[in-house]
Amino acid sequence: MLNAETYVTSTEGTGGRIRVHNRDFEVEEIPLTEPSGSGPNTWIWIEKEGRTTLDVLLDIARELHLDRRRMGFAGMKDKRAVTRQWICVSNTAPSEVKAIEERIRNVKFLRVTANEKKLRMGQLLGNRFRILIRDTEIDEPLETAKATLQELEDKGVPNYYGWQRFGSPRANTHLVGRALVHGDVKGAVDSYIGNPLEGESEIVSEARRAYDRGDLEEAYELMPSSMRYERMMLRPMLRDLRRGEFSDESYVRAIHALPKPLKRMFVHAYQSYLFNRAVSERAALGINTHIPGDIVIDNDQHIIHDADPDELEELILNFEAHPTAPLYGSKVPLASGRPGEIERRILEDEGVSLEDFNSIKVPKLGSHGMRRAIRFRIWDVDAHESQEGLTVEFSIPRGCYATSVLREIMKKDVV
């Protein structure tokens, strides 16, 4: 995981491989509520394979001839997986939605019903995972996995952001965000459209090289349909170029051409990159203990004030409170003591200040920041073996990453 160095469990790693096939990695959303069956909005319980949530939403919006902003979902789900989740289409009849199912690639509509309310981001309890680990590398992988899961139940799981947060497989959205926070909008656009990486197809690499040469027309012509977001960014740049009006504002327009969830993700990815480093260094001091200077939150995300160290220690051991690290932003409080030293050193190493997160040249992409727990709780764990390999099952809260659990089991970086 990007910028993650620390393990919190004492077991050896099972090794192995995940996601050999999409069906090796299953995710099912744990909803906060079920739709009522009546109302102006249509909720769809979808199963998708090998596709991002955002791509599916865009396809459904296109087939229904709707603005993407009419679509709602509770959380992004993995691309390289089989996932099930609710999505919502506002002010649309279920019959209209059912009519387009066959036109949405690699997606099944398992249930289509109505509801009074729309579905908003974050409106889920968590996610349930069933993951097959193939080709394990030790003699007793099942016993090791069970021991690791038990330790994680006792201590908590490091709350690292997974590779998906950074735009896997390119995993460079944090670099786009870093450029934005540093005030370099051109550098942000260049990082996203250009900069071919090893492992990309030749046509994709050639399109990126054309962009890096400054040949925007050729880059656009070369780009396959899979580069839909790069093409979105290039359109306003090409329009300005053809009119002889190309300027620094053209790069701002390129960012604004993207769907809102994606363009917001850039700064969030950079915050996540820094957060992972803070978690890694803080977890090395003990993930389930209070260190003087910690900012501690309860399960409702409220900072706990005026509690003595012994009380905080007991709350943390009982999973009623959690040490935190910063998602850096213009208004986030920083810890004191040893945790605070870690947090301030990270800013110094990056050459940024908290205020830089609110001084971004692209409007509405700044962030005030927040404190986030350095660990999360895992529940309903299970593990078993078959001829295919080792299967682990567990549930985790919304916004947390299964790869953090797998990393502890396998003792290797996982994507």
From Swiss-Prot:
InterPro entries membership: PsdUridine_synth_cat_dom_sf, PsdUridine_synth_TruD, PsdUridine_synth_TruD_CS, PsdUridine_synth_TruD_insert, TruD_catalytic
Gene Ontology MF: a single term: tRNA pseudouridine(13) synthase activity
Enzyme Commission number(s): 5.4.99.27
SUPFAM superfamilies: Pseudouridine synthase (SSF55120)
Keywords: Isomerase, tRNA processing
Record Pfam families: TruD (PF01142)
Segments forming domain TRUD: 156-376
Keyword match Glycoprotein: no
Top-level division of the source organism's lineage: Archaea
Primary enzyme class: isomerase
Residues of the active site: D78 (nucleophile)
Reaction(s) catalysed (UniProt annotation): uridine(13) in tRNA = pseudouridine(13) in tRNA
Gene Ontology BP term (one): tRNA pseudouridine synthesis
HAMAP family in UniProt: TruD
Family that this chain belongs to: Belongs to the pseudouridine synthase TruD family.
Function as written in the Swiss-Prot or TrEMBL entry: Could be responsible for synthesis of pseudouridine from uracil-13 in transfer RNAs.
PANTHER family cross-referenced by the UniProt entry: PSEUDOURIDYLATE SYNTHASE PUS7L, TRNA PSEUDOURIDINE SYNTHASE D
Name the UniProt record assigns to this protein: Probable tRNA pseudouridine synthase D
